[in-house]
Amino acid sequence: MADNPTLGEWLVRRGASRRAVLAYAAHVGALMALPPAARSALAQGLASTRRQSVIWLSFQECTGCTESLTRSFSPTLENLIFDFISLDYHETLQAASGEAAEDARRAAMAANKGKYVVVVDGSVSTKDGGVYSTIAGIANVDMLRDAAKDALAVVAVGTCAAFGGLPAAKPNPTGAVAVSELVVDKPVVNIPGCPPIAEAVAGTLAYLVAFGALPELDSLRRPKAFFGETIHDRCYRRPFYERGLFAEGFDDEGARRGYCLYKVGCKGPVTYNSCATLKWNGGVSFPIQSGHGCLGCSEPDFWDQGGFYRPLSTSMPGIGPTLAGAAVAGAALGGAAAWLSRRHLKSFQAGADKPEGDAS
C-alpha cells in the first residue's frame, strides 16, 4: 500500500471491514439528517480520503469541550483519532510537551499546508496584545492567526470559541472574543455548547473528512443538522407546556410529575441545540430529563442574560410576546381544564353518594 494511505486502506490495515465503514457512515448520516444518497457518498468519501490532519488549539477554556469529546460514543475518541483523523496537536491528549509539542504543531502545519483543519476551544484574549493567555510564550491571538493562515477550515468548538463564552462575561477583563471575529478569510463553523455534545463535534469532523467542506450552516455558522431546531421543539415535556402544566419550584408536585420547567427558568424555547434528541453520554439523558431547566448555553451572551432561574419574558432578547403569550394562554387553558376535571369529579362523587333509586 502507499506510504500515505487513504482512510479506507488505513482501516483495512487495522482490521475494519467495509461493512463497518458503511455502518459508521450511515450512523453519521442519520445524525446529520442526510438523505440516503448522501450517506452513500459519505461512506465513499470516508473510504477514499486520507486521514485529516487536525491542529487543536486550546485557549481561554476549562477543558470541558475536550472532556465531552472523550465521551463520544459514535465514533469513540480512540476511533476518531486513530482511524479518521490525525490529531497532530492537542495540549491535553498529546504525549509530547514543551518545545517538542510546538515542533510537532509547526511540522504538521508545514506538511499539510492548505489541507489541515484547525479546531479551537476557548475564547481568544485580545486586550493588551493578548498577554493574558499565552502558550509557549505566544499570545493566543497570534497563534490562531498563524495556524488559520494555511488551514482548510476552522472549527470553533464550545461556546467560548464560538461566541466568547464565560471569559467574555462583563466586564470582559481579557478582551475575550470569538474565533470568527479574528478569522475572516477562512471558512469557520461554530459548534457551541458548554460543553458541546460530543457527537455534534465528531459528526461535523467526519463530514469535513468525507466531503472536504463544511455542512449546511445557520446564520450563526452552526451546523443545521445539530442546531436547526430549539430544544423546546423536541422536548418530551412540551405537551405539559401546551396544557399549561408547569413546575413552580424544583421540589413541588409539578416537578415530581415531570411538568414543564418554563416557570423555573428553562431557556429551551429560545435555545437551538440537539440535546433533546442526541442527549448525552450515548443518549442516556440531558439536563431537562434530569430535572433542571435548559440554561441556553449554546446561544450567544447566555452568561449575561440575568438569573438562570428567572422565567423567560418579553424583556429578554430573542423572545417576543408570542411565546410569552403562549405560555400564559397555555397556563390559562391548563387551569380551565383542571377546573373542569375537578368539577366533573365532584359531580361524579355526588352522584355516587346518592341512595339507589333517588332521582332528585
Q: PLM ranges: what are they?
A:
Residues 10-20, 30-48:
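N-terminal twin-arginine translocation
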Residues 314-326:
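Juxtamembrane/start-of-transmembrane alpha-helix segments at the extracytoplasmic/lumenal side
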Residues 210-279:
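A conserved mid-domain beta-alpha-beta active-site/ligand-binding segment of alpha/beta enzyme cores
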Residues 51-53, 60, 64, 83-109, ...:
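Metallocofactor- and cofactor-centric catalytic cores in central/energy metabolism, strongly enriched
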